[in-house]
Amino acid sequence: MGKTYIADKETLDKCYAILSADGIYGFIEHMDVLSPTARIEYIGQNKDFTPISLNKDTGTMTLNSWADFPIIVANKPWMVRADGTPDYRLDENDYTKKEDGTASDVSNTSYNGGAFSWLAKIYKQEYMLGNDRVVKFSMRERDGFEPVGFKDPSNNVLEGVWIPMFYGSILGADTSTPKMVSLAGLQPCYNNTTDKEHTAIANFSSRAAFLGGGIVQTITDLLIMFAKSTNSQEAYGYGNSSGYDASLAPTNGVKQNAVVGGGQFYGTKDAKSLNKIFHSIVLGTYQQWMRDPYTLLVNGRYKVSKNYTYDVTGAKYQDTGISLPKMFESDGSAQKYGIFYPHKYQTVPGFGAVPVHPYKGSTSTGGCDGLWQNVEIVAVALRFGACSNGLADGLRSLTVYATAGLASWDFGAAVLLLPPVGVAA
């Protein structure tokens, strides 16, 4: 006889409401299921969708049922002025050209702006249901949904945001006005403190921020949904996650920003190539940790900024009430910093989800990505991983063991550009 599962009426009502809702897309992440594909259950409009599929031999992505999803359709590459207004579209398959075939400014260091792709505003609802995490998306405003990552520091709701197509490079690094840009042909910046990175970002634009915080959470959940999997490397490519080469010091295998063909997505399996997601090599390459000062671990407690307010002490941030325990080396003599592999992620309303203890995953199960932690300092988050971390890298890979003042060859940053209120691409 088959098993019968009985849920309480409140749970069933919530599930039925999700499934019957018009225009709501989403998934349930079953934390107790470790398989990266089996733990994701489609709900709502996409209940019967076929996930995206990557051919890692050719790098080609097939969008399947997601081909007409508004976020994917609207995601185009642009040259964008420093004030956040769009200048002109780039050829989707060759960023060195404008749409009309003439030369672009994608590597022009005199251009007052940079190369960014448009991520249109989407509303999100996220909550825990027992050990499950429910994530729902809507293109229009609804009760209980928030535009997570789409609010500026004044809490204005934006029509979208500009995702950096390239790692942050600092022009005039030795001058009084260093400026971080998103352009091809430049080496990603490294060996800078968080404050130095922040200064360079602010010098680029008053509408510029770090690529971090709630928008990374929203992007990650969209990509989990598209792939129906939490294994981001397997779903989107392995990037340059194993490209470390000590003979190439001081950058040690971190590749120069370059134009990569293949359109919106490009993913390979060699783990030594520039890959891209949403036209961004920052999201797909995993070659350098990206500083996220909007996510802190303050003496073991997560504190977050929901609107790109910058405060590396965390005094101005929301206390999530979620803590990580102190872990010890096997002999109990000292704190163990990692590497850990989370399988459970706890929702922070209006922000996203953070990894929590216990850690029962691996590079191919649970969240599939690594976690490093230090619960005795004020740690500023680093995301995605570096070219020395291999399979521990990924969209959910997280380091919360470094202070704001720590600088390294494998620490960098990228510019998120906020458009003026009411401006859309």
Please describe what each predicted stretch is:
Residues 272-301, 306:
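Extracytoplasmic, non-cytosolic globular domains
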Residues 25-32, 47, 217, 238-254, ...:
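C-terminal, surface-exposed recognition/capping segments
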Residues 199-202, 206, 293, 312, ...:
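Extracellular/surface-associated beta-sandwich interaction domains
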Residues 103-113, 140-284:
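Short aromatic-cysteine micro-motif
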Residues 12-174, 204-214:
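Extended N-terminal export/anchoring regions of large proteins
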Residues 1-15:
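Short, low-complexity N-terminal tether/leader segments at secretion or assembly junctions of large
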Residues 168-192, 302-327:
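A solvent-exposed, charged loop/short amphipathic helix patch at secondary-structure junctions
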Residues 127-129, 297-303, 404:
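Cytochrome P450 core scaffold surrounding the K-helix E-X-X-R motif
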